[in-house]
From Swiss-Prot:
Coiled coil: none annotated. GO terms for molecular function: ATP binding; kinase activity. It is an enzyme of class 2 (transferase). Belongs to the YFH7 family. Its EC number is 2.7.1.-. Signal peptide: none annotated. The keyword Transferase applies. This is ATP-dependent kinase YFH7. It comes from the Eukaryota. ATP-dependent kinase that could be involved in endoplasmic reticulum membrane assembly. ATP binds at G66, P67, P68, G69, S70, G71, K72, S73, T74.
Length: 375
């Protein structure tokens, strides 16, 4: 009886805090409603969405978007940490060491990436001959991602960036108790590799402007979002749970498809394959990056694809240029990309600032985007 009261109180507390969160937007003359970053409130909102969608959506997605130096990565990390802490606390209160895995989802009814064509023999040969990249297509934003079956049975999806930016889908999944309830998927794993940039018609400019829209495998990132959207709309099993977390634990599906996604190694300055693994444990996916609301080429599809799932939250972090300039200049200096803070400022002005202004001028227009302040 005491346990039931505790779960009811937590659920009630979350709903009340979500209401308080919603009425504290800063009403200003901007394209989107504004509010100050409050990680606890953001976690409430994310869990509230999951609770609202739980009968029809196995998982939900969150987009955190902002210019370089806006703190989007930190916000995403703090948010995932807060959500995972709350779920772990729930499991401890219920004396649960692992999720139940009691009822199966409808995942077996969904063929992920079924619309992606098989790789052709000539393309496969070109991939092998060029060390895993496709030099002829590295600048082709209209390149159609392709798939191939690996020896272990996994399905690999690759775009114009080739193997460095590929993601894989596995249906033969061993239960992994270490996976997180909320996971971050940074856009960084879709930076075109330096080998790809060297294959551009103007490789010097490509390396100089690394981080600009043409230097990402936007083709395959959009395809990843389509695949994630499919997993969002998979219907979970049914149960009589009274709280959101209880429902998630009881409907955990250990056989849910696993998606392995590339990350980015800053020491190697290149993407790293299979850095992130989203499996049946992952019920909240936090995508963060600069171009997730960019209303041009493949990026413009990201918001629409995920919005159509009915299980999406979008937060755009806005901040003045002079603030992000200082932050990024110091970051360039501290990471060894610039010999001084002043040189870091010049690097920022010649690349990062251009990208930030490009995004502001070309934001997806949606009444469901909330702007955050992170000064």
């Amino acid at each position: 009886m005491l346990g039931c009261f505790f779960f009811f109180f937590i659920q009630y507390k979350v709903q009340v805090e979500i209401f308080v969160f919603k009425v504290h937007y800063l009403r200003e003359d901007t394209p989107f409603p504004k509010m100050v970053v409050d990680v606890d409130a953001l976690a409430n909102e994310a869990i509230g969405l999951l609770d609202q969608c739980k009968d029809d959506n196995y998982r939900v997605c969150i987009l955190i978007v902002g210019p370089p130096g806006s703190g989007k990565s930190t916000v995403a990390q703090d948010l995932s940490r807060q959500i995972n802490h709350r779920f772990d606390e729930y499991r401890l209160q219920g004396n649960q060491k692992s999720a139940h895995g009691g009822t199966r989802s409808r995942a077996s009814d969904v063929a992920l990436a079924s619309d992606v064509p098989e790789i052709t023999t000539p393309l496969s040969e070109e991939l092998a001959f060029n060390g895993g990249i496709l030099p002829k297509y590295v600048e082709d934003v209209n390149f159609q991602p392709v798939k191939r079956r690996l020896e272990n049975g996994d399905l690999q999806i690759l775009g114009r960036g080739g193997l460095p930016n590929a993601f894989t889908i596995s249906n033969d999944v061993e239960p992994d108790e270490e996976s997180s309830f909320a996971q971050i998927v940074p856009m960084d794993g879709f930076h075109l590799s330096r080998q790809c940039l060297s294959s551009f018609q103007n490789p010097q400019e490509a390396h100089k402007r690394r981080g600009s829209p043409p230097t990402f495998d936007s083709n395959n990132f959009a395809q990843l979002c389509k695949t994630l959207a499919q997993t969002c709309t998979i219907k979970p099993g049914s149960c009589d749970a009274k709280s959101c977390f209880e429902f998630m634990a009881k409907t955990y599906d250990p056989h849910f498809p696993c998606i392995k996604i590339p990350g980015f190694d800053h020491s190697l300055k290149d993407p790293t394959p299979d850095q992130f693994c989203l499996n049946g444990h992952t019920r909240i996916v936090i995508l963060e990056g600069l171009y997730l609301l960019y209303d041009k080429e493949n990026w413009q599809r990201v918001h629409e694809i995920l919005q159509n799932t009915g299980s999406l939250l979008v937060w755009y972090i806005d901040i003045e240029d002079h603030v992000i300039e200082e932050r990024v200049a110091k970051r360039h200096f501290n990471s060894g990309l610039a010999d001084s803070v002043e040189q870091g400022r010049l690097k920022f002005q010649g690349n990062d600032l251009l990208n930030a202004r490009l995004i502001r001028k070309n934001l997806v227009q949606s009444g469901k985007v909330v702007t955050l302040r992170n000064d």
